[in-house]
């Protein structure tokens, strides 16, 4: 990451406040003089796809990120945004724990089902899932990665890769986003 890069971190259902790895990542970017936006999306515990799309489109327009880091439902949100007109291509997209495109959960039902967009609007994409994620089966995660011809990292026994599964500070994502070797 160059100090002029702008990183947008998008949380999933319920937010990603500390000690979640996304909160830790936002802090690390700021400590390294990076430019980061880590907004709390509207009504995060009872999200609406249309409200989130509207909010994030405005953030994209105003902040103009180079890198976007999505966790969970934010990946589905990104897919919906990619169906919208006028999307600009970003440099890097990190997709962590995307849920099934056919998720059946009453509280987030406006997001599903979701079709894969033709264009993912990112020059470089990396996807991370866990073999024990309750929100997606490995076969589906592999199909999504293959569809976009993107690298898929499968982390063993990491649940939904969130604070509840032990992912507060996550060195790997920090190294990748900050381009540390």
Regions found by a protein language model. Give the residues of each.
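Catalytic histidine neighborhood in serine/cysteine hydrolases
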Residues: 34-37, 146-162
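Catalytic histidine-centered segment of alpha/beta-hydrolase-like enzymes
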Residues: 47-48, 158-169
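Conserved loop-alpha-helix segment in the C-terminal half of the alpha/beta-hydrolase fold
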Residues: 26, 131-151
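Active-site nucleophile loop of the alpha/beta-hydrolase fold
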Residues: 12, 40-44, 93-103
């Amino acid at each position: 990451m160059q100090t002029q890069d702008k990183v947008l971190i998008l949380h999933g259902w319920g937010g990603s406040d500390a000690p979640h790895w996304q909160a830790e990542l936002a802090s690390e970017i700021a400590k390294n003089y990076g430019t980061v936006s880590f907004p709390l999306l509207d009504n995060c515990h009872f999200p609406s796809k249309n409200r989130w799309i509207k909010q994030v489109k405005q953030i994209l327009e105003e902040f103009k990120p180079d890198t976007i880091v999505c966790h969970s439902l934010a990946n589905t949100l990104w897919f919906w945004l990619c169906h919208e007109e006028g999307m600009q291509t970003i440099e890097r997209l990190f997709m962590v724990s995307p849920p099934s495109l056919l998720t059946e959960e009453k509280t987030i039902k406006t997001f599903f089902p979701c079709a894969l967009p033709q264009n993912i609007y990112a020059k470089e994409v990396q996807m991370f899932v866990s073999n024990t994620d309750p929100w997606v089966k490995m076969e589906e995660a592999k199909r999504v990665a293959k569809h976009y011809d993107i690298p898929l990292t499968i982390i063993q026994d990491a649940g939904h890769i969130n604070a509840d599964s032990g992912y507060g500070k996550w060195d790997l994502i920090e190294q990748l986003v900050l381009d540390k070797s």
